[in-house]
């Protein structure tokens, strides 16, 4: 079932059409967020449950699974879901819209959203993050990597690895930090950075579900 909103439908179709190109381009976990990944892993107990939210071709799903974590991966793209089911057969992989997570409360120790949350409009981000908070256990970890812009805005731009245009939300760092805190998270790390050879400024946020709800 395709997304009803035309912009989100365009995002879904863009990744379906470019899934093989994207998967070939990004075969391994992004090295430019390895620092964040190591911090995320260091705080997770052995055997933790992780939701890879917007898993793409599954490079992080595979890494977490290899490390012994119990991984559930979701994506809006049918093609990515097919690819990841083959790539990581011991992970649970579902087609799902991250704006409407169909999981019980407190199901996961960690939620990983690497360059996926950027496809959610600012007007819907608070509700989406509240959904993330709901499926995390108390103290559960949250990570997101996003596009950083000169202002917070919804734009159409070219996706690396596919050379296809679709919609992304660019963020001012202070704006997204405020929204993350407003959704019940404590931020432990927030950094602007740029990928070598990349075309966009980026940012990452690492935090955990606060007990001050």
Can you name each region flagged by the protein language model?
Residues 168-183:
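Short alpha-helix
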Residues 110-124:
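A short SAM/SAH-binding and catalytic strip from SAM-dependent methyltransferases
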Residues 1-45, 143-167:
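Conserved class I S-adenosyl-L-methionine
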Residues 126-138:
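A short glycine-rich, Lys/Arg-flanked "PGG" loop and its adjoining helix->strand segment in the class I
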Residues 51, 57-100:
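Class I SAM-dependent methyltransferase SAM/SAH-binding core
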Residues 99-111:
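A short acidic, Gly/Pro-enriched loop at the edge of an enzyme's catalytic core
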Residues 193-213:
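Core SAM-dependent methyltransferase catalytic element
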